[in-house]
Each structure stands twice: as structure tokens, then as C-alpha cells.
Amino acid sequence: MSRFHLPLAAAVVLVSCLWSANALVRPDGVGKLPALGWNSWNAFGCDIDDAKIMTAAKEIVNLGLKDLGYEYINIDDCWSVKSGRDKTTKRIVPDPAKFPDGIAGVADRIHDLGLKVGIYSSAGLTTCAGYPASLGYEEIDAQTFAEWGIDYLKYDNCGVPSNWTDAYTFCVPDPGSASTNGTCPDNENPAPQGYDWSTSLTAQRHQRMRDALLGVEHTIFYSLCEWGQADVSAWGNATGNSWRMSGDITPSWDRIAAIANENSFLLNHVDFWGHSDPDMLEVGNGDLTLAENRAHFALWAAMKSPLIIGTALDGIDPAHLEILLNKYLIAFHQDPVIGRPAYPYKWGYSPDWTFDPAHPAEYWSGPSSTLDGTLVLMLNSEGSRQTRTAVWKEIPELKDALGRKGRRQTGFRVTDVWTGKDLGCVRDHYTVTLESHDVAALLVGKGC
């Protein structure tokens, strides 16, 4: 068992779990369910200030997103003075031109709205945009963030000095660095068989901040952003509340499909207290079609990934807002009784268990206590209109269901998750025609 600083040592425990070796469990419940919120980076990059952050916070409330559970307003990179830390206190200094009331002032106003606030740093000497980062200053920064009232830390992997670079290279099977079966044949520096990546320098850099956060009296959700490096799925759950499993997302279907494919092979690590993070949402960004926006959100929700909105909320397209406000998908995502995500039960376009960045698994299912039924997704990963059919006897949660006379149940009440329409008693299967890159989302309920 890891050793933690005394203030929270008795309040935070590492417990053995089926889905991972360990998990961070807090008595206040922070981190049990995947995070819901908003982040500044995908919308604004470095062009942030007090006004933009507060506008996002107010829109989370005004648009009804807060009512569904969206709660974190996260300030990403570029919030501090770039020239360096305070020479006396060694603290990171908020940029007074961007945040005249400091980060604490913003946090106070966000808290007044009934929301929580997040901040950004990196496990290196500088952030990805070249601002002061936290390696070597973990305890100072954790204490500073706690005093400011910070509730969430996104912790990146930039600015790493050579003496903190891993001895080996882990295979992150992103397109461009992997073969079609998810391996990295060109990796010239693989770890020896049986190597424990939780002892790697990447893991140690992130564990140092974990210990510092656990040493303060204020709970801070810890989001690891290490891009899937160093086999983070094996140690992320003992280090943070969520962990990035790949490189960055972009507002393009090719990238969204590739990340969904990659994450579909990592879902055995996901349950209460620990969530694999396929990066922030791009709903509302770029040239994604409405179908692609829907599929992106549905897959992220079904995988119980953090749902962190990444678009400007003032002036958001009503159709995109409707996606973010889908009460069925949020209810599945925030289930307080069932922690496991939906899993692929059939790949569809490709043979089962095929690692294909262009065509992720198309058929997904997962049980839900909040919906009192099973969530079923059918994806069209192809570039043209196609039909997809969900066959009840193929779905793990439904295939063994018994009717009143002990016979296999063949009919179920079905609801269209996108429209809320009751589709009635559907027997044996349900077929739908989908536009390119769209997804059908069904709630399959009681037998009939």
C-alpha cells in the first residue's frame, strides 16, 4: 500500500478491485463517477481570460447543463505568468491581465453558482504551451490550488527533462505509430517482458502529485493527461481518478473513431473510482456532421468516459446542445449502482476483436439501474447510409432473459434514446437505417 501524507491518509484508501489492481476511494465520493464539466482548451486554446471562463460557468447553469450534473469549469493551459514563479514563495502566479481577481477570485464566483472549478499543470518543468509547471514543486502547487479552492486538476505530460524520461517506450497504438492490429512493430526500445510500468519515471512523476494532493485538506479530482504512455491503464487507477489513454483528440471523425476503437480494448479497467479518458468532447467543434457529433457523444457516454465539454457555450447550436443534454445517456453515464461501462458485443463491419481505427466496434450494450434496462448502441462506421440490426439473443444482458412461463424472452419494450419515443413491444430484433457515422441509441426495458 502506498503511503500518503497524514491529513488525508485515514480518509483515502486504496482498495483491491476486480477492474484494476487498486483504486483511489474517497469518503466524500469525489471520483466515484466519471466527471462532467467544461474545459477551455478545445474552444479557446491559450486565448483565455476571466470573462470567457465566467461566461462558460454561467451558460452551464443557464442552458440546463448543471441540472444534469455538469459541474466542473476547468481552466486549461496559459493561465499563469509565463516568465516564471514568484521568486520568494515559489508559487505559480496567475496572469493579472487575464485574471485580475486571480484564480481564487474566479473560483469564488464559480462556487457561488453551485459549480466547481478546475486548473491545469504538467508533470514537467513547463506546460505544453511553455508556462511554469509542477515537477519538483508538487507540494507547493497542491497547497496553492487547495487555498484557491480548486476542485479538479488536469495534469499534463509536457516539459519532461531528460533525467525524468522513461528508460523504455510503451506502445500507444495511435494511428501513425501502430500496425492495424494495435501493435507497434517499429518500437526500437520496448520494455522487457514483465516490466512493471508503475515503477516507471512517468508513473513516479504523476504519483508525486497524487501524494501532494492527498496531503492537503481540500479534495481535488485528479485527472492524468499522460497520453496513454507507460501503460497507464495498469497504474492510473491507483494514481488518479481518470487517465488519458491516447494522444489528443481533434474535431474530425477519423480521430474520434480511432480513439473509440483504441479505448474499446481498455474498458476492463473502468468501473467506480477509475475512468479511462479518451479526451475532451469535440461536440460543436470543427466540421463534424450532426450524426458524427451524436456518435461521438454516445460512445463517450457509453464508455463512461469523462464528459468534458470543449466548445464555446454562448451561441451553441441548439442541435449540439440537445446532444449534450440527453437525459438517457447522462443517466447511464452517472449510474450510482452499476459502475461498469457498456461493452462491445459485436464488431459488425469487422470481425469481432479486430483493432481497426477506421471502423470501431459497432454494437454495444450495458446494464443500467437508472434507466431500469439495457442501453444498446448501433454505429454505422461506414461512409454511406447503412442498416444495422440489434438481435436480442446476441446481447449479453438480454439473451438469457426469461418470460413468465420460464421461456426465453423474445419481446422487450424499447425507447429511442435520441427522441424519447416509445417504440413499443419489439420482438426478436430491431433494425434501423443510419446515415454515415451515425449511431442508434436504444433503451431496451422490460419484457413484453
Curated annotation (Swiss-Prot):
Q: Which residues are glycosylated?
A: 163, 181, 237
Under the heading Gene3D superfamilies, the entry gives: Aldolase class I, Golgi alpha-mannosidase II
**Binding, substrate:** 226-230
Q: What is this protein called?
A: Probable alpha-galactosidase B
In terms of one coarse class, where is the protein primarily found?
secreted
Keyword Signal on entry: yes
The places in or outside the cell where this protein is found are: Secreted
Any one GO cellular component localisation term in the record: extracellular region
